[in-house]
UniProtKB/Swiss-Prot annotation:
One of its GO terms (biological process) is lipid A biosynthetic process. Its EC number is 2.7.1.130. Pathway: Glycolipid biosynthesis; lipid IV(A) biosynthesis; lipid IV(A) from (3R)-3-hydroxytetradecanoyl-[acyl-carrier-protein] and UDP-N-acetyl-alpha-D-glucosamine: step 6/6. GO terms for molecular function: ATP binding; tetraacyldisaccharide 4'-kinase activity. Transfers the gamma-phosphate of ATP to the 4'-position of a tetraacyldisaccharide 1-phosphate intermediate (termed DS-1-P) to form tetraacyldisaccharide 1,4'-bis-phosphate (lipid IVA). It holds the Pfam family LpxK. It catalyses: a lipid A disaccharide + ATP = a lipid IVA + ADP + H(+). Belongs to the LpxK family. It comes from Shewanella denitrificans (strain OS217 / ATCC BAA-1090 / DSM 15013). Keywords: ATP-binding, Kinase, Lipid A biosynthesis, Lipid biosynthesis, Lipid metabolism, Nucleotide-binding, Transferase. ATP binds at T58, V59, G60, G61, S62, G63, K64, T65. This is Tetraacyldisaccharide 4'-kinase. GO terms for cellular component: plasma membrane.
């Protein structure tokens, strides 16, 4: 299903023309939602803590999670105490809940589980993001909120908006849902603070973000293992993310010999026996987000590829300069 949809959004499938009228309806509904919350006070005024949105205007993965981790580490180096909120996509969450250090992706979602496993940041998940902020404030002394996604969640006031785009696929065919991948029109990019280009050629007013691969780690232990994986050996690669081809290309570019590639839907739950059968006796390499969902049944020869976001120092300075006066505002 995901491949068929991507062919409509990023290819030349003529079915998109049948969906354009529905895109008009989507535009009307989303416009009414925006107007409902227009003129809301900033988060630093309304909540007593500034909110940084890390979102996108397209459906699917664009690199938000590495950017969230990058911001957590950047802010901590400057002495800030960030907390993170998320919807927890792919799972049903009643109310809001804190994400514990060893939280299961089944309970909180794969991205929140990965973020906390990597950073141990205070984090809350749930469909009501304002309630998630309140829960964090009751349990932790935080001075900045990072919202993982939520650009279109206008009920949540915000101070800074970062939009991440896939530098290769960009905006697809340029149509709103369901004819295209856009959650909002391209006009929305004129209202944000920074447009982050993940892995493409940055155009005017775009900040380039590169994902730097790190050494492979064992899915079972998140440790390197006694021996590194020999790149001369054939391997199986799998990815359940928005753009699996990007991951496979990254592995090939590092010299791994991909015998088979397995592309799954984003946020897809995995069956242990099915993956064992698909990989056979070959080493299996997956994304860090997928590893979070597989660690309870991982085999000894299963590995994952961590990546770190890298942005230029000018962006860091500009963001910190924008943030500093907001942290001092109290309701």
């Amino acid at each position: 299903m995901q491949r068929w949809i991507n062919n409509i959004w990023y290819g030349s499938n003529p079915i998109k023309w049948l969906l354009v009228p529905l895109s008009g309806l989507f535009w009307l509904i989303s416009s009414l939602r925006r107007k409902k919350f227009a003129g809301s006070p900033s988060a630093s005024e309304a909540l007593g803590v500034p909110v940084i949105i890390v979102g996108n205007i397209t459906v699917g993965g664009s690199g938000k999670t590495p950017m969230v981790i990058y911001l957590i580490e950047l802010l901590r180096r400057q002495g800030y105490r960030p907390g993170v909120i998320s919807r927890g996509y792919g799972v049903k969450i009643d109310g809001v809940k804190l994400v514990e250090a060893q939280a299961s992706a089944v309970d909180v979602g794969d991205e929140p589980a990965m973020i906390v496993a990597r950073t141990q940041v205070p984090m809350a998940v749930g469909p009501d993001r304002l309630a998630a902020v309140s829960l964090l404030q009751r349990h932790y002394d935080i001075d900045v909120i990072i919202s993982d996604d939520g650009l279109q969640h206008y009920k949540l006031t915000r101070d800074i908006e970062l939009v991440i785009i896939d530098g290769a696929r960009r905006f697809g065919n340029g149509y709103l849902l369901p004819a295209g991948p856009l959650r909002e029109g391209l006009w929305r990019l004129k209202t944000i603070d920074w447009l982050i280009n993940n892995g493409g050629k940055a155009q005017d007013n775009e900040v380039l973000m590169q994902l730097e691969p790190k050494p492979l780690l064992k899915v079972k232990s998140s440790q390197p293992g006694l021996e590194s994986l020999d790149k001369a050996l054939p391997v199986v690669a799998m990815a359940g993310i928005g753009n699996p081809a990007r991951f496979f290309d990254s592995l090939s570019g590092q010299g791994y010999q991909l015998k088979h590639t397995l592309a799954f839907d984003d946020h897809q739950a995995f069956d242990a026996q099915a993956l064992i059968a698909l990989a056979g006796d070959l080493p299996l390499i997956m994304t860090e987000k997928d590893a979070i969902k597989c660690r309870d049944f991982a085999q000894d020869n299963w590995w994952y590829l961590p990546v770190n976001a890298r942005l230029n120092a000018d962006f860091d300075k500009a963001l910190l300069a924008r943030l500093a006066p907001l942290v001092q505002i109290k309701p």
